Amino acid sequence: MTKVLALAEQVVRLPGAYYHYLQREGSAMNNKNCARNVEILYAFDDILGWFGEHGLREAYRDELTFLAISHLLIAASLRVARIASKSELLGQFSDYMEKNFPDFRENRYLPRLDRNKRLVYRLLLKRRYRVVRLLFRIKDGR
């Protein structure tokens, strides 16, 4: 979808929801196997490569950075931290962000994060993975 939007001449918003997303039981999103979450790094390598090949990486730098913040740094880190707060993957996600998006902390879209995601984002930056895990255990009632 990201690649399609980058090449679209026009984007319109429709009043209803016309896309039904299905999360399969074995998908990386629902899997209790931490190692499956490494796949998001491959996906971002693909996205960044495609945008680079098409000369669009710099034009969409802020948007790609925020996409990585949302999906890689926050969502994937949350999935892993909830399973194993000492997983090496958490460091790999942080390293990937530093290497590919060195100025991600100044991204202009960060204010769009809601309060909860902003809290998680700050905890992840400080590598407080056990605190994140504990917060979600409390939230989930476990």
Region spans (language model):
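Nucleotide-sugar-dependent glycosyltransferase catalytic core
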Residues: E9-A43, R57, R82-A84, E88
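Amphipathic alpha-helical repeat scaffolds of TPR domains
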Residues: T65-L78
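Short charge-dense sequence patches
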Residues: M1, I40-D46, K126-L135
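Hydrophobic residues within well-ordered alpha-helices
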Residues: K3-L5
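C-terminal, non-catalytic tails of nucleotide-sugar-dependent glycosyltransferases
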Residues: Y42-E63, P102-N107
